[in-house]
Swiss-Prot record:
Family in the record: Belongs to the protein kinase superfamily. Ser/Thr protein kinase family. CDC5/Polo subfamily.
Record's compositionally biased regions (Basic and acidic residues): 41-53
Pfam families: Pkinase, POLO_box
Organism of derivation: Saccharomyces cerevisiae (strain ATCC 204508 / S288c)
EC number annotated for this UniProt entry: 2.7.11.21
Catalytic residues as annotated in Swiss-Prot or TrEMBL: D204
Keyword Cytoplasm (UniProt): yes
Name of the molecule in the record: Cell cycle serine/threonine-protein kinase CDC5/MSD2
Length: 705
């Protein structure tokens, strides 16, 4: 049974009576204390004043948890007594003890000293944490049991997690294998998906706040920084979190705020840390960490290889723009999850890496589905997919009636106090793995490839494109895509056979590319500037005006049922009256791009550029924008500001760096080298995989009766 979203926290006193143990908070609730030394959840932080990294003060401030006295051996409440057991750990404002009821059941008691209560504000914070945690009911979230108080302390009773945290696991093992991280990530995604469905943002997801139960399933705990949104569009503005895990929009969003995406970012940080051994933005001081986060300055060390599929997932999650991060549903569709997937985590995981090599592909898929079911992911994902199918259907209808296609754009915080695996030690949040296995036969390799391509196709959902009215035009475009895709596949085959002799390498010719563009399709159309300085506008009605840079002339291009496109050439001085408005729009965009946009390349017109070129089609995907030019060149502008163009029927690849450096190579030579020479940060192979899938999709002609 699904629960509705939580209501926003208000000032009314909370009823903390649990259904399991009827022991309400007694006395004046104004005496309750909040996490005051957890200053990050309330103060608008200057990054220079993080309490993890503050310079030495004249007088060291005592942690508020130190005010918490050891509870009596027998803790009496109304209707039920508890026997105090071992000390489990402490955080910034609370201490945690093991306690046992009369039946012998053991719990973790998060204990907050009343002496640390200084204001109504801190009381409300503690009540907020209690209310939010009490409302959570998910197999991968630490269960809230009860809340009560005595004369000295407030006690929050929680499900006990006897096997430590992910932080402890990483400290012991140094680095984890991809199969176990797939398992952990799936469970974490299930818990986050549930929280977000209740409009709850955790805001402090980190390895130290995720615990192991008795069966080594994960449980998210510590809701001290959690917030409830009144509605889906509400934003939060408090700078809070743990330095290594904090999202860039939290650091930079004083005016724009942050929302659910901060938890997605933290997931990406944890994923990287588990596979590499430390957080991606780790540095000696907090200011450097913050600067690296704001610049998305991280890389994958060569001495700790992870799969390309894992890198793609991490890079996408750690997108600077929150809107560009994949949703939890989209994350579960990534190819990476189709790798080896265990049925469970063995009890020896804390001391040694599990061996899952014998799990067959088919069983891995079964295990993955089973894990999603247990984490309550499948039900919510299925409804998301229904909505996605509706959007795709509506989009196909739009294209059939010749409209523009628009698709759905598309501080130490209690690191161990919920787990008896913790100690008094304050954890520091710093934190070929899976050798490539040979497949037994070609059939199995083909099955895996098909499964990966199916998932990749889901990533490449167009968010906008120009409408192609002519069926012959669609066939020409599909043929060009097919030709270029075959050229790439042929180059890959040549590379596997040892490459080509220099005499057979294709001659280097820099293609004409799009150097500037403006998408104004909500009114006029799509404007662009080519490396030849020619300016074009692809209007919403499908026609194009291309104004030449080296002559007072222009082309007017429209669809043709026999040729695909037909182009008419005019002198500017002899322009037809009906095209005057078109040229005014071209001039407007030319001035706009000159004033506001910089060229992405130094390429210009070469002597081998005999014909004028225009843009036939553009398509905006989440990973990149794809341009299809009339000379058969395909250009891909990726969201990380790297650009690639495939020309000469797939034989040549052009790379443009974020700093506008441009170079062209035979594709087979780049494949042989393994990356764009001199540009290891280009992530060439990952981008080529996306390019091939984009071309493959466009090779299929979709017609509507």
């Amino acid at each position: 049974m699904s629960l509705g979203p939580l209501k926003a926290i208000n000032d009314k006193q909370l009823n903390t009576r649990s259904k399991l143990v009827h022991t309400p908070i007694k006395g004046n609730t104004a005496d309750l204390v909040g996490k005051e030394n957890h200053f990050k959840q309330t103060k608008r932080l200057d990054p220079n004043n993080d309490h993890h990294h503050q310079p030495a003060q004249k007088k060291k401030r005592e942690k508020l948890s130190a005010l918490c006295k050891t509870p009596p051996s027998l803790i009496k409440t109304r209707g039920k007594d508890y026997h105090r057991g071992h000390f489990l750990g402490e955080g910034g404002f609370a201490r945690c003890f093991q306690i046992k009821d009369d039946s012998g059941e053991i719990f973790a008691a998060k204990t907050v000293a009343k002496a640390s209560i200084k204001s109504e504000k801190t009381r409300k914070k503690l009540l907020s944490e209690i209310q939010i945690h009490k409302s959570m009911s998910h197999p991968n979230i630490v269960q809230f049991i009860d809340c009560f108080e005595d004369d000295s302390n407030v006690y929050i009773l929680l499900e006990i997690c006897p096997n430590g945290s992910l932080m402890e696991l990483l400290k012991r093992r140094k680095v984890l294998t991809e199969p176990e991280v797939r398992f952990f990530t799936t469970q974490i995604c299930g818990a986050i998906k549930y929280m977000h469905s209740r409009r709850v943002i955790h805001r402090d997801l980190k390895l130290g706040n995720i615990f192991f139960d008795s069966n080594y399933n994960l449980k998210i705990g510590d809701f001290g920084l959690a917030a409830v949104l009144a509605n889906e569009s509400e934003r939060k503005y408090t700078i809070c979190g743990t330095p290594n895990y904090i999202a860039p929009e939290v650091l930079m969003g004083k005016h724009s705020g942050h929302s659910f995406e901060v938890d997605i970012w933290s997931l990406g940080v944890m994923l990287y840390a588990l596979l590499i051994g430390k957080p991606p933005f780790q540095a000696r001081d907090v200011n450097t960490i913050y600067e690296r986060i704001k610049c998305r300055d991280f890389s994958f060390p060569r001495d700790k290889p992870i799969s390309d599929e894992g890198k793609i997932l991490i890079r996408d999650i750690l997108s600077l723009d929150p809107i560009e991060r994949p949703s939890l549903t989209e994350i579960m569709d990534y190819v990476w999850f189709r790798g080896t997937f265990p049925p469970s985590i063995p009890s020896t995981v804390m001391s040694e890496a599990p061996n899952f090599e014998d799990i067959p592909e088919e069983q891995s898929l079964v295990n993955f589905k089973d894990c999603m079911e247990k984490s309550l992911l499948l039900e919510s994902m299925s409804s998301d997919k229904i909505q996605r199918q509706k959007r795709d259907y509506i989009s196909s209808i739009k294209s059939s009636i010749d409209k523009l296609e628009e698709y759905h754009q598309n501080r130490p915080f209690l690191p161990h106090s919920l787990s008896p695996g913790g100690t008094k030690q304050k954890y520091k949040e710093v934190v070929d793995i899976e050798a490539q296995r040979r497949l037994n036969d070609l059939a199995r390799e083909a099955r895996i490839r098909r499964a990966q391509q199916a998932v990749l196709r889901k990533e490449l959902i167009a968010t906008s494109t120009n409408v192609i009215k002519s069926e012959i035009s669609l066939r020409i475009l599909a043929s060009e895509c097919h030709l270029t895709l075959n050229g790439i596949v042929e180059a890959e085959a040549q590379y596997k056979m040892g490459g080509l002799p220099k005499s057979r390498l294709p001659k280097i010719k820099h293609p004409m590319i799009v150097t500037k563009w403006v998408d104004y399709s909500n009114k006029h159309g799509f404007s662009y500037q080519l490396s030849t300085e020619d300016i074009g506008v692809l209007f919403n009605n499908g026609t194009t005006v291309l104004r030449l840079a080296d002559a007072e002339e222009f082309w007017y291009i429209s669809y043709d049922d026999r040729e695909g496109w037909v182009a008419s050439h005019y002198l500017l001085s002899e322009k037809p009256r009906e095209l005057s408005r078109h040229l005014e729009v071209v001039d407007f965009f030319a001035k706009y791009m000159k004033a506001n946009l910089s060229r992405v390349s130094t390429f210009g017109r070469e002597e081998y550029h005999k014909d004028d070129v225009f843009l036939r089609r553009y398509t905006r995907y989440k990973p990149f924008v794809m341009f299809e030019l009339s000379d058969g060149t395909f250009q891909f502008n990726f969201k990380d500001h790297h650009k690639m163009a495939i020309s000469d029927g797939g034989k040549l690849v052009t790379y443009i760096s974020p700093s506008h450096e441009s170079t062209t190579y035979p594709l087979v030579e780049v494949l042989k080298y393994g990356e764009i020479p001199g540009y290891p940060e280009s992530n060439f192979r990952e981008k080529l995989t996306l390019i091939k899938e984009g071309l493959k999709q466009k090779s299929t002609i979709v017609t509507v009766d």
